[in-house]
Amino acid sequence: IDTTDYRSITPGWILYNYPEVEFIIKLLRHTTCKESCDYCHTQLDVLHNLKTFFGYERFRTYESEPLQERAAQAAVKGKSLLAIFPTGGGKSLTFQLPALMAGHSVHGLTVVISPLQSLMKDQVDNLADRGITDAVTINGMLDPITRSLSIQRVQDGEASLLYISPEMLRSKTIEKILMARHVVRFVIDEAHCFS
């Protein structure tokens, strides 16, 4: 594992033979210790990373409640949550920021399940417009070369966000990819796609 490259991932054979390794790495790299710790401030603080990744000084509030920040912080802490925001209310940020943070700190992969291929493409394109190239989508609309490149980016640890449709969960290719990566969370974007 190349410790100087945040995209370096634990080899699949280690994950297969020693599955507890990822848990230990997560404990070591994803547990806050004290206020003065530089690592905790730069790697685990949601406000610091909001500025680093997205250039925002603060999260949105709703009727003076920091709901967006609470949702992002809960995800960073590994809690399961249900976040309901209005259209355009910043819901995507609540899973994208923790996904990027986990990608950098524990080489984790966040799988986002979304019913619309156009929405997946928009999400990946919007992140790319911000200079964030950690997201890919794998879906039936991709030409074979683009699909192959997306798969390779996930396998090589270059992607920390993978957008797929619910149907793709049945794909043997997707299953193989996910088994070889440390999946830190699944996000259901538009919960009605599982009804």
Predicted regions and their residues:
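Short loop/turn elements that form and flank the Walker-type P-loop nucleotide-binding site
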Residues: V76-K79, S105-H107, G131-I132, Q155-E158, ...
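Conserved helicase ATPase motor motifs in RecA-like P-loop NTPase domains
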Residues: P86-G89, E190-F194
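Conserved pre-motif I regulatory segment
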Residues: E35-P86
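N-terminal accessory nucleic-acid engagement/regulatory domains that precede
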Residues: I1-C40
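Conserved SF1/SF2 helicase motif Ia
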Residues: I84-G89, T94-A135, N139, G157
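Conserved helix/coil segment N-terminal to the catalytic DExD/H
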Residues: L100, D125, L142-R185, C193-S195
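Short, flexible loop segments at the rims of nucleotide/cofactor-binding pockets, characterized by
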Residues: R58-Y62, T87-G89, T137-L142, L162-I164
